[in-house]
Amino acid sequence: MSSSSFVWTVGSIALSSLITPTIADGSGSRYQLTEAWQGEKFLDHFKFFSGSDPTNGFVTYANQSYAESSGLIEVTESGSFYMGVDYKTKLSPNGPGRDSVRIESKEYYDEGLYIIDLQHMPGSVCGTWPAFWSVGPNWPYDGEIDIIEGVNKHEANEIVLHTSGSCSLSSENDMSGTMSSSECGESSGTIGCVVKGQTGTSGAPFNEKNGGVYAMEWTSSFVKIWYFARSEIPQSITEGNPDTTAFGTPMAHLQGTCDFGERFKSQKFILDTTFCGDWAGGVFGDSGCPVSDPSNPIQSCVNYVAENPAAFKEAYWEINYIKLFQTGTGHSTASIASQAETATAVVSKTVDSVPSVTSTPILETTAPAPETVSAEAPATSSAVPEPANPQTSVAGAETTAAPAPSPETTAAPASPSSDDSEGADAVSETTIYVTETTTICGASTQKGTIQTIGGGETEVSPASSTVESAATPAAPTPTSQEPVASLPGTTVNDGTPVPTDVSPETPAEETAGESGAPTPSAEQPEKPQPAATSIETGIVPPPVSNPAPTEQGTPEGASPVDATESRHVPDEPAPTSAAPIRSPSPSSWTISSSSRVALSSSFASTTSSASRTTSATKEATAPTETDSGASTGTNPESPVFTAGASKSVGISGLAGIVCGIAMAMLA
């Protein structure tokens, strides 16, 4: 690969990691669908209100089970949602009110575009007070928006806003409705600012035209509400990409000196039908409804509602859908995920292109649940690992770059929770991250040459002799770099050690699940550590637990690696090329919470089962000789970097990559 091509590849890393996620939408609309409430799943977004009516209505709100069993709610054959009232039972004016339903959204919502498609709304019936509205958690300070509301023989929708203090609107805004009050604040009492729509936008005339659509655009500067008859619904709405700039003149354009961003906070949506109460009962006599007690319009309303159940058969909502749109949120998650995949894929391609770097086929370990072999001995004895077959053929070093994840790769299952019950095998994970590759030049050990592969991994030249298994403890391998736990080497195919590296940010105390293994003996050697064990192709012995840093460091004379369980992994066919060992996660590429890009292939994640404690002291590293005389070197760990951008590859890291690769190419 030419130097210029490599530079372009490195440049693509920076671009893919630094570009801010954008809206992945090619349409002209700036609104993206976030939620759709309809059909069988309509009620998934609502909870039932069954308390006393806050507006003092003559009503009994049903809970969900009663509403379903009594037929007050149902999903129709056409897929619409029906929500009605009891229209069969004659009541006593002095008893409980008429059964009805009030549902409230489970969540609160912010500024956006909200569209409701109604096949039917409660008709123009005396005593009714239907409403579709929203309200903040702290009324009136967080505001209230009445999108659809009417009482008694209503035929024109009334849009009302309520908030605290003084909130004045302009009546000069272009709108089809008529503003009768411009003060939304509580200084005007409970009236609020009111815009009344044209006749036919509510009640019986609305239903006679096969219903229609209401749309509300709520921003920090204004609230606009449109009404569209069934035959006049904009094409952008029917196509699912609403464009408010093409909606035309709204029924209500609510804007003025009022700060909407401050006065109207997160809102929940409410759909209900009540009877009489403060408004419908208060104006009952002025609406052309029968008055039984001229001195008490509210009591006249209650009398009518109690004694005339059949009048309320048309007092129902039939909703085709409610859709929620917000600016640029519909695809943002997918965009971020796509960006992460792009960044990691480019990193893999760059590392694959490094010349003169060889890798040995590495088997992938699928865990947890391998067999645990331990000595059947009293509690004073320690777990003994079952040695693998020491006869291993030496394979020549292949000049094959570590491949990107392929369908052949078997993903390791997710590690169990730390809350697993006692007796379960806990699997800890360590992820090796893309690091600054300033250690590309070869390093020498006592018996053999170690070539730096990257990320702290090493490779011994094929001249190294086959390492035989050793079940006896070996002396620990201290380190001269930043605290890194030395792990026992394992050999695969050609006797090449498979090093295990650990990030400095390994959790301080990660307790493994107990599988009944005996505890270590007090007579155990002072610094126990299993030596390297060679294995047959297809069997990968698990690594010894990775020590985690401690504040005090390792006491002098103490072993940096505690006695661990031995875990035997079932045979698995070896991949034809170098296969990555991945951490237990849904995919082979991960973006960690510490803003590092995890790299697959030979930069491997390893799993282990043991208590983990790592020395925080700085000690010198020396190669460990095996029984056969081959040396297993511990390569200095490459520094892990955190870039300035929260999820980007650092510029300093890129400079290190370029310098390191240039040195390797010149060599």
From Swiss-Prot:
Question: What do the Gene Ontology cellular component annotations say?
Answer: plasma membrane; side of membrane
Q: Which residues form the signal peptide?
A: 1-24
UniProt superkingdom: Eukaryota
CDD domains associated with the record: GH16_fungal_Lam16A_glucanase
Compositionally biased spans, kind Low complexity:
395-427, 448-483, 574-622
Task: Work out whether the entry's keyword set contains Glycoprotein.
Answer: yes
Protein family membership: Belongs to the glycosyl hydrolase 16 family.
Instruction: Kindly give the membrane topology term recorded for this protein.
Output: Lipid-anchor; GPI-anchor
Query: Where would you say this protein principally sits, based on its record?
Result: membrane
InterPro entries membership: ConA-like_dom_sf, GH16, Glycosyl_Hydrlase_16
Q: What are the alphabetically sorted keywords of the record?
A: Carbohydrate metabolism, Cell membrane, Cellulose degradation, Glycoprotein, Glycosidase, GPI-anchor, Hydrolase, Lipoprotein, Membrane, Polysaccharide degradation, Signal
| Residues carrying lipid (GPI-anchor amidated glycine) | G644
Ranges where the record places region Disordered: 354-427, 448-646
Q: GH16 domain: from which residue to which, for each copy?
A: 25-288
The active site lies at: E144, E149
The identity of this protein, by name, is Probable endo-1,3(4)-beta-glucanase AFLA_105200
What is this protein for, i.e. what is its function?
Mixed-linked glucanase involved in the degradation of complex natural cellulosic substrates.
